């Protein structure tokens, strides 16, 4: 029998077809176009017919590339970057071509870009500025073409052959417009059936216009005039963005699919996906010569004869000459003027701008000046072309040219808040006002020759304007008594013009031609005008002026900025007609309108500076020369010189300097903060001046030019009437008539020491002789005298005792004589240095007061004559008047180096002293700050270890109650307000206190290292009200009682709150003291019915009441461990008692003559207390109550007292809690056996190790507790499942690794994979038998009972399923006969099929390995953002029928894929859920194509009934757990409140918005809106009254950056 012929080779053909299908080998095709597209982070090229998922990066590392175009002939690629607000370019045909900036200023949101390849121009749209602009390809000659009637212009396309440009506008009135490329013949061509026209492109061959509408989901086309509109694609688009075409194919990008698609340009057929899984596809172009055909234009030859721009036009002669923005075209129609002539200069907070007033577009151009922080005022010099401005944040005055070059800082010292600025363009001077220093000052225009013109009676000076022709200046003051003032340009002849009906007169402008003065008031909301002499006041405008700030005048118009409207407007000064120049520009400050080419007016200062060497001032009377600070005018009245010596004197709130030679040089030193200056001295080596202020009770210093004012002593002064500088030892001495002390400190106020405090009676004037080592002073007490002592305060000796009230003691160092004025005899006397040889120098004086000596003269002041005079120092003859008309000159001196000459030991290395070097006759002695101890060997000083601290209302003082030290010294602690309680840490040497603002603070005793432990301003519990505090020095903790919450709290000394240790419903703990040595705290409990004294362990346990009777109001407690006693004082019973620490042996210690006791403490053998009413600190012996002594009297407003004793390091180390807090995490308590016991605050529990405190258990037994983070508990099944659910990923830590042949149990156990779903629990948690009704492995059969058995066990005649279902429905057939020819003939094809299947499997495996490797990430085969969409399926199992959609279509790689959750602008690209998957939605409610693009979400968003945060049956467990049935692995989205709309008021000064990169999450609550991708609201507002609406946010999110709009303004949201 003939063998059967071989069958057809169809297995091999099938194999070939499968290989082609699997590996995607393309068939030969014609050349396909290259697509150039922006992908936000980069710009790419892709071959439209090439291999899928392959693209070439043209340029990477971009911020936010949006629009893109090219110039094919040059290989140039252009794109816009909306984050960098720039247009940039690079080249395709150059290796390593650099990115170049084309336009980098004046852009906000450049959405559209088009290249005119013929005319070599760039056109672009800006949807924020609402402009369409054009420039050369290199960005030069930039011009605004359209600025009106634009709302949200986006895409732009050019047709150079016909001279037309087209653009889309998706604002309030969506439309497509056409205009000539020169800006002519503008016309709307499409305005119906249009909503969000995104993409736009032109078919140059068929002369068709294509556009895409993202809202209406279609692509249409029409003729270029808008006629014959046709549908191309409709209804099946998700979110098309940009379009382009090539041949018969139309290409577009889609935001939602993140892909590039294509179809037939006429029918919409042949739809296909070109490239997918893009980051964020934006604009797209076909990169080919056909898209940019070349032809000749008239602009090719000599630029069309144009000086700047030659723009193509649709009308004869088919081109137009144009000028850069703001520049006018001359009458010849070809040449542009040199530049803008009338310009508006604008200061914004962080930039300067210029606006041309020559052209109607009013485009603002940013000056390229760096480091502008907070520009306020601005002005211009038309001669040199400099722009001047003030910066309030950097505290400087700067200037630069109009193009931004030549930036300089002119003034940056002694300037606080420079609000106004004005240029005297004639005299070349610069004036400014400063609301911080309350001055008006002037310099030359280059910043030299600075001089203060006005410094008195200024409150809040702001605007300033100059009239150089009349020699006048005008300024506004918006302080408590607002006014407008006028003075000569030199500051003289000051007068008030307007002081009625003013609020905040911010702006000021002069009309030089008309002689008018205009101002704008931000409080009365008016613009008013008067004549320059103050007459004929009238209102020009008072409608809709919410907050005027900047103000200027040019020609017939007044211009102003408005803070609230965010606009620049102008009004005609005669007609009062009004225009808006710029709308919705935030951060507007000052402005100046100028004619840059026109100089108006002159005066004599224009001619060689009026002959002045420095400053020239033209005044209504004459030209006056002025000198800068530190120089004097010579008798020629023109030349300024540096004087050899000069007089300095104090006069109440000012310190002046005058010439020794002439009487016309009285100059106030520009010092700030002087109230009532008294004593005066100087340090010539450092050019410092020192003065005392008896009103402020301070000693201050500054440089002689008035700069760097600082307080050197500001605590513990009462009436510092005398003061002298030790210029050799660099020390400062002063006498205080209030405290009856003479003190010394370093010149900076450090190391303060009380020198003399005994036997003083109103010390007054001081004089020093450092060369000899003596100090001299006068006393005005009951027995006035003149005294001498060593400069260390020792060896006091009365020199003159028969004298009246001697004042202003002065030493003639050359002749060794003392001089003084006697206020009782009205004489000036002199003696030798021992008080002998007394001589009367002058005795016919009405009322001499201040006195100084220099050279051969003495100088004195006379209160009755209001003068300063001089006379011969020996005879009193040759009296000369130096200065008259002076009131209450307190002190006077001559500033000259001869007054501070000589040598002593302290001049060299401070005499080797650690702190103070004090000169004495024949040598020196080292000294220390009060209470410090000198080490004689090292000459260093040691701080006190045993002392008392007591607090007053606004001071804390230190006291050492012995005879060797000065008793008390106020510590330099700043900001003390109503101190209530104090304590001290002897280890770190910090003082702790409670103040009246509910703060607990600390600082070193020298005021350094201040720190706030707890404060309401830190956002802590607003109910906190600390009452008392006590420190545990061993555990480094602070215990404090709270009046508001009635608790005892504990803080670490580092500032960390530990929690509450004691609380009760009826408890009111107040006074507290910690006895850490024995592990107890004692406190008073001021319960409603009866006061108590209680004791408890440091953790609040072991609580016991010691006393409930014999108490009314115990206010202070103190423990003495030496005696084992507890002491307390009762303010109402007015007695001090004691008892044993256990409460036994109660004893009254003192109850006589106690009026208002507050504090109590123990130091050594004595018990100290304070009595607020008697203003005393007293003490008794602590054991007997005997020897009651008053320690300090006349101490007002006492509030607390605390004793500090030296801590024994041996005893400290022996404490069980001293080392590492006894090993405890929180509270360490010393036990009686010397071992520590750890405990916790009430909100925590002690864990099993008995050392650490932790949260109480809140998770159920079948849950896993996260270590930290906002999620507390997760289901136990999620532990070690490969996906971190805890914020800190602690659920995936410490997990065992199971092999591929093992099944990982939920709790980490590994079992044989074959035991999965075998009907028996092999995992300890039974997780191997969970979900068996839904899942079996690919080689398993699912039984009806849910059990899984091997497929080969099915129908094997042996029941393997529990219910025997594996043996049901089996057909029992007889094995075929071996000799059957029919069956024999089928063996070959069967073998071929089997071989084919094996080969296909191998190819599939290879393809999977190759393709999947493309997406391998650091964390596994896929990046982190792609997560499994089927959480119940094993990780190596592909769900049946589970088609793989999304960005990796057709690629499974062993996992079912789903796009990650996106946060709008995040990396995922899709919203959390869409409208078609909202809770309760019917499955048939929508036929959106989203269902085919992404796998369905398994569960809807949580509802109130299912969300465990709203309903939880496990009521005793934490509700902070995610839902057990999860639609996807949770990417926890933190709650974020919507940003506030910066609706400003009249005092609003903050217009900043959140960064566009950081404000994406708050849109999530809008995801379920019926319009899932609405555009952001337009920022442009109509001309509305501020009373009706708030101005919109100054910066909205990019329209394509976030797909959702910001929440509505709270002012306009009707909901």
From Swiss-Prot:
Segments carrying motif PPPSP motif A: 1500-1506
First and last residues of every YWTD repeat: 78-81, 123-126, 166-169, 251-254, 388-391, 431-434, 474-477, 559-562, 690-693, 819-822, 859-862
Residue numbers covered by motif PPPSP motif B: 1538-1545
Region annotation Beta-propeller 1: where it falls in the sequence: 32-288
EGF-like domain: residues covered: 295-337, 601-641, 902-942, 1213-1254
Effect of residue 142 to Q: In OPPG; uncertain significance
Effect on the protein upon substituting residue 540 to P: In EVR4; the mutation results in significantly reduced Norrin signal transduction
Keywords: Developmental protein, Disease variant, Disulfide bond, EGF-like domain, Endocytosis, Endoplasmic reticulum, Glycoprotein, Membrane, Osteogenesis imperfecta, Osteopetrosis, Osteoporosis, Phosphoprotein, Receptor, Repeat, Signal, Transmembrane, Transmembrane helix, Wnt signaling pathway
Consequence recorded when altering residue 29 to T: In OSTEOP; uncertain significance
Documented effect of changing residue 1168 to H: In EVR4; an individual with total retinal detachment and retinoschisis; is unable to transduce Wnt or Norrin signal transduction
An example Gene Ontology CC term for this record: Wnt-Frizzled-LRP5/6 complex
Effect ascribed to mutating residue 1551 to N: In PCLD4; uncertain significance; the mutation results in significantly reduced WNT3A-induced signaling pathway
Resulting phenotype, residue 520 to V: In OPPG; appears to traffic comparably than does the wild-type protein; appears to be post-translationally modified similar to wild-type protein; is unable to transduce Wnt signal; has a significantly reduced ability to transduce Norrin signal
Effect of residue 244 to M: In OPPG; appears to traffic less well than does the wild-type protein; appears to be post-translationally modified similar to wild-type protein; is unable to transduce Wnt signal; has a significantly reduced ability to transduce Norrin signal
Consequence when changing residue 1517 to C: In EVR1; decreases protein abundance
Glycosylated residues, chain numbering: 93, 138, 446, 499, 705, 878
LDL-receptor class B repeats: 75-119, 120-162, 163-206, 207-247, 248-290, 385-427, 428-470, 471-514, 515-557, 558-600, 687-729, 730-772, 773-815, 816-855, 856-898, 989-1035, 1036-1078, 1079-1123, 1124-1164, 1165-1207
Extracellular side: 32-1384
Disulfide partners: 299-310, 306-321, 323-336, 605-616, 612-625, 627-640, 906-917, 913-926, 928-941, 1217-1228, 1224-1238, 1240-1253, 1259-1273, 1266-1286, 1280-1295, 1298-1310, 1305-1323, 1317-1332, 1336-1348, 1343-1361, 1355-1370
Outcome of substituting residue 852 to M: In EVR4; uncertain significance; the mutation results in significantly reduced Norrin signal transduction
Region (Beta-propeller 4): 945-1212
Motif (PPPSP motif C): 1574-1581
Region spans: Beta-propeller 2: 341-602
Disease: Vitreoretinopathy, exudative 1: A disorder of the retinal vasculature characterized by an abrupt cessation of growth of peripheral capillaries, leading to an avascular peripheral retina. This may lead to compensatory retinal neovascularization, which is thought to be induced by hypoxia from the initial avascular insult. New vessels are prone to leakage and rupture causing exudates and bleeding, followed by scarring, retinal detachment and blindness. Clinical features can be highly variable, even within the same family.
Function: Acts as a coreceptor with members of the frizzled family of seven-transmembrane spanning receptors to transduce signal by Wnt proteins. Activates the canonical Wnt signaling pathway that controls cell fate determination and self-renewal during embryonic development and adult tissue regeneration. In particular, may play an important role in the development of the posterior patterning of the epiblast during gastrulation. During bone development, regulates osteoblast proliferation and differentiation thus determining bone mass.
Name by which UniProt lists this protein: Low-density lipoprotein receptor-related protein 5
Organism per entry: Homo sapiens
């Amino acid at each position: 029998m003939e063998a059967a012929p071989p069958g057809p080779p169809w297995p091999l053909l099938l194999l070939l077809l499968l290989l082609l299908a699997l590996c995607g080998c393309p068939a030969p095709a014609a050349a396909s176009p290259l697509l150039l597209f922006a992908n936000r982070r980069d710009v790419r090229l892709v071959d439209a017919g090439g291999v899928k998922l392959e693209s070439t990066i043209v340029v990477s590392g971009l911020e936010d590339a949006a629009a893109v175009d090219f110039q094919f002939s040059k290989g140039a690629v252009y794109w816009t970057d909306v984050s960098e607000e720039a247009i940039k370019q690079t080249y395709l045909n150059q290796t390593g071509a650099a990115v170049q900036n084309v336009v980098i200023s004046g852009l906000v949101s450049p959405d559209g870009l088009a290249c005119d390849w013929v005319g070599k121009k760039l056109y672009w749209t800006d949807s924020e500025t609402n402009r369409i602009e054009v420039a050369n390809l290199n960005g030069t000659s930039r011009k605004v073409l359209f600025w009106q009637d634009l709302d949200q212009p986006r895409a732009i396309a050019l047709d150079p052959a016909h001279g037309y440009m087209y653009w889309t506008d998706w604002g309030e009135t969506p439309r497509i417009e056409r205009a000539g490329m020169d800006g002519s013949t503008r016309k709307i061509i499409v305005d119906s059936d249009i909503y969000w026209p995104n993409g736009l492109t032109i078919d140059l061959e068929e002369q068709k216009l294509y556009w895409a509408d993202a809202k209406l989901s279609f692509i249409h086309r029409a003729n270029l005039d808008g006629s014959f509109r046709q549908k191309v694609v409709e209804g099946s688009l998700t979110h098309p963005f940009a379009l382009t075409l090539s041949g018969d194919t139309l290409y577009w990008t889609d935001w939602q699919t993140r892909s590039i698609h294509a179809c037939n340009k006429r029918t919409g057929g042949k739809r296909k996906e070109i490239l997918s899984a893009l980051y964020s596809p934006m604009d797209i172009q076909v990169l080919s010569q056909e898209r940019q055909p070349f032809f000749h234009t008239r602009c090719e030859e000599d630029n069309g004869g144009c000086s700047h721009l030659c723009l193509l036009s649709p009308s004869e002669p088919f081109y137009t000459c144009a000028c850069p923005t703001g520049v006018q075209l001359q009458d010849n129609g070809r040449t542009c003027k040199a530049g803008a002539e009338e310009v508006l200069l604008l200061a914004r907070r962080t930039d300067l701008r210029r606006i041309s007033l020559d052209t109607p577009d009013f485009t603002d151009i940013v000056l390229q000046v760096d480091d502008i922080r907070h520009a306020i005022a601005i002005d211009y010099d038309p001669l040199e072309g400099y722009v001047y401005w003030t910066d309030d944040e950097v505290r400087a005055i700067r200037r630069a040219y109009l193009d931004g070059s030549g930036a300089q800082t002119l003034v940056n010292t002694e300037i606080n808040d420079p609000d106004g600025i004005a240029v005297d363009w004639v005299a070349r001077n610069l004036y400014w006002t400063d609301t911080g220093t309350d001055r008006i000052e002037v310099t030359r225009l280059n910043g030299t020759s600075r001089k203060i013109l006005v410094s008195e009676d200024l409150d809040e000076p702001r605007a300033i304007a100059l009239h150089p022709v009349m020699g006048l200046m005008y300024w506004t003051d918006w302080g408590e008594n607002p006014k407008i003032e006028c003075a000569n340009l030199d500051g003289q002849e000051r007068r008030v013009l307007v002081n009625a009906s003013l609020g905040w007169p911010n702006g000021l402008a002069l009309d030089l031609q008309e002689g008018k003065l205009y101002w704008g008031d931000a409080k009365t909301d008016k613009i008013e005008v008067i004549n320059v002499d103050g007459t004929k006041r009238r209102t020009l405008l008072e409608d809709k002026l919410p907050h005027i700030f900047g103000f200027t005048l040019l020609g017939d118009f007044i211009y102003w900025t408005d803070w609230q409207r965010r606009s620049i407007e102008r009004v005609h000064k005669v007609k009062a007609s009004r225009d808006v120049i710029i709308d919705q520009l935030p951060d507007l400050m000052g402005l100046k309108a100028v004619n840059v080419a026109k100089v108006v007016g002159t005066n004599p200062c224009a001619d060689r500076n009026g002959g002045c060497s420095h400053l020239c001032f033209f005044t209504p009377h004459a030209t006056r020369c002025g000198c800068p600070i530190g120089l004097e005018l010579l008798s020629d009245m023109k030349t300024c010189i540096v004087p050899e010596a000069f007089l300095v004197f104090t006069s109440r709130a000012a310190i002046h300097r005058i010439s020794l030679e002439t009487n016309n040089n009285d100059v106030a030193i520009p010092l700030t903060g002087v109230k009532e200056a008294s004593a005066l001295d100087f340090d010539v080596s450092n050019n410092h001046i020192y003065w005392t202020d008896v009103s402020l009770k301070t000693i201050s210093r500054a440089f002689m030019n008035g700069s760097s004012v600082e307080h050197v002593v500001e605590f513990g002064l009462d009436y510092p009437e005398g003061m002298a500088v030790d210029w050799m030892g660099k020390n400062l001495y002063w006498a205080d008539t209030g405290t009856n002390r003479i003190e010394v400190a370093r010149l900076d106020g450090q190391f303060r020491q009380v020198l003399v405090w005994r036997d003083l009676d109103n010390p007054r004037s001081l004089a020093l002789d450092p060369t000899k080592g003596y100090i001299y002073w006068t006393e005005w007490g009951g027995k006035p005298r003149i005294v001498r002592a060593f400069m260390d305060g020792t060896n006091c000796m009365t020199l003159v005792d028969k004298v009246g009230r001697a004042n202003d003691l002065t030493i003639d160092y050359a002749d060794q004589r003392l001089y003084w004025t006697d206020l009782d005899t009205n004489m000036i006397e002199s003696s030798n240095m021992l008080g002998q040889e007394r001589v009367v120098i002058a005795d016919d004086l009405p009322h001499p007061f201040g006195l100084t000596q220099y050279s051969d003269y003495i100088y004195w002041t006379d209160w009755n004559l209001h003068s300063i005079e001089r006379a011969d120092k020996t005879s009193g003859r040759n009296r000369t008047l130096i200065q008259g008309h002076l009131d209450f000159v307190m002190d006077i001196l001559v500033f000259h180096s001869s007054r501070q000459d000589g040598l002593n030991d302290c001049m060299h290395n401070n005499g080797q002293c650690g702190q103070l070097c004090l000169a004495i006759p024949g040598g020196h002695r080292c000294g220390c700050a009060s209470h410090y101890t000198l080490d004689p060997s090292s000459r260093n000083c040691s701080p006190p270890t045993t002392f008392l601290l007591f607090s007053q209302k606004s001071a804390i003082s230190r006291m050492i109650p012995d005879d060797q030290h000065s008793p008390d010294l106020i510590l330099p602690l700043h900001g003390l307000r109503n101190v209530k309680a104090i304590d001290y840490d002897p280890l770190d040497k910090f003082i702790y206190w409670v103040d009246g603002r509910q703060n607990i603070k600390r600082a070193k005793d020298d005021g350094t290292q201040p720190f706030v432990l707890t404060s309401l301003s830190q956002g802590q519990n607003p109910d906190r009200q600390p009452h008392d505090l006590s420190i545990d020095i061993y555990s480094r903790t602070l215990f404090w009682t709270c009046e508001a919450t009635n608790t005892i709290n504990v803080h670490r000394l580092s500032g960390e709150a530990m929690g509450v240790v004691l609380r009760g419903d009826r408890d009111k703990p107040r006074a507290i003291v910690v006895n850490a040595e024995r592990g107890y705290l004692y406190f008073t409990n001021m319960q409603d019915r009866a006061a108590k004294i209680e004791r408890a362990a440091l953790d609040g346990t072991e609580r016991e009441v010691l006393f409930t009777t014999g108490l009314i109001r115990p206010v202070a407690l103190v423990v003495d461990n030496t005696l084992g006693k507890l002491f307390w004082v009762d303010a109402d019973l007015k007695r001090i008692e004691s008892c044993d620490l256990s409460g036994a042996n109660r004893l009254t210690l003192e109850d006589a003559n106690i009026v208002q006791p507050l504090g109590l403490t123990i130091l050594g053998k004595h018990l100290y207390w304070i009595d607020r009413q008697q203003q005393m600190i007293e003490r008794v012996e602590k054991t007997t109550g005997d020897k009651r002594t008053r320690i300090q009297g006349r101490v007002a407003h006492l509030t607390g007292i605390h004793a500090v004793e030296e801590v024994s390091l041996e005893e400290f180390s022996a404490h069980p809690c001293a080392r590492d807090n006894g090993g405890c995490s929180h509270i360490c308590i010393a036990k009686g056996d010397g071992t520590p016991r750890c405990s916790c605050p009430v909100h925590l529990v002690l864990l099993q190790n008995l050392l650490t405190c932790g949260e109480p258990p809140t998770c159920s037994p079948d849950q896993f507790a996260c270590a930290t983070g906002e999620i507390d508990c997760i289901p136990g099944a999620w532990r070690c499942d490969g996906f971190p659910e805890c914020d800190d990923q602690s659920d995936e830590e410490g997990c065992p690794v199971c092999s591929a042949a093992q099944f990982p149990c939920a709790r980490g156990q590994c079992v044989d994979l074959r035991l999965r779903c075998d009907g028996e629990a092999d995992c300890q948690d039974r997780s191997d038998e969970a979900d068996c009704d839904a899942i079996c492995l690919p080689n398993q059969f699912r039984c009806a009972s849910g059990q899984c058995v091997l497929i080969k066990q099915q129908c094997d005649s042996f029941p393997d399923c529990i219910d025997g279902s594996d043996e049901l429905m089996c057909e029992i057939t007889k094995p075929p006969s071996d000799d059957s020819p029919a069956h024999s003939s089928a063996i070959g094809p069967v073998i071929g099929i089997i071989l084919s299947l094996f080969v296909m499997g191998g190819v599939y495996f290879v393809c999977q390995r190759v393709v999947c490797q493309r997406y391998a990430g650091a964390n596994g085969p896929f990046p982190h953002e792609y997560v499994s969409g089927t959480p119940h399926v094993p990780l190596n199992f592909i769900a049946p029928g589970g088609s793989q959609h999304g960005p990796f279509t057709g690629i499974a790689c062993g996992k079912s894929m789903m796009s990650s959750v996106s946060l709008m602008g995040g990396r995922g690209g899709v919203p959390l859920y869409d409208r078609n998957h909202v809770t309760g939605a019917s499955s048939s409610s929508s036929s959106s194509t989203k269902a085919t693009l992404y796998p369905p979400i398994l569960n809807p968003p949580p509802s109130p009934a299912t969300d465990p945060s709203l309903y939880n049956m496990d009521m005793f467990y934490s509700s902070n757990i995610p839902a057990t049935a999860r639609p996807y692995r949770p990417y926890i989205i933190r709650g974020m409140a919507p940003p506030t709309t910066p609706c400003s008021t009249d005092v609003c000064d903050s217009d900043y918005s959140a960064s566009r990169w950081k404000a994406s999450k708050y849109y999530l609550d809008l995801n379920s809106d019926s319009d899932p991708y609405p555009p952001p609201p337009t920022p442009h507002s109509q001309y509305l009254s501020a009373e009706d609406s708030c101005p919109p946010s100054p910066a909205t999110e990019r329209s394509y950056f976030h797909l959702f709009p910001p929440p509505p303004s709270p002012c306009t949201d009707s909901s």
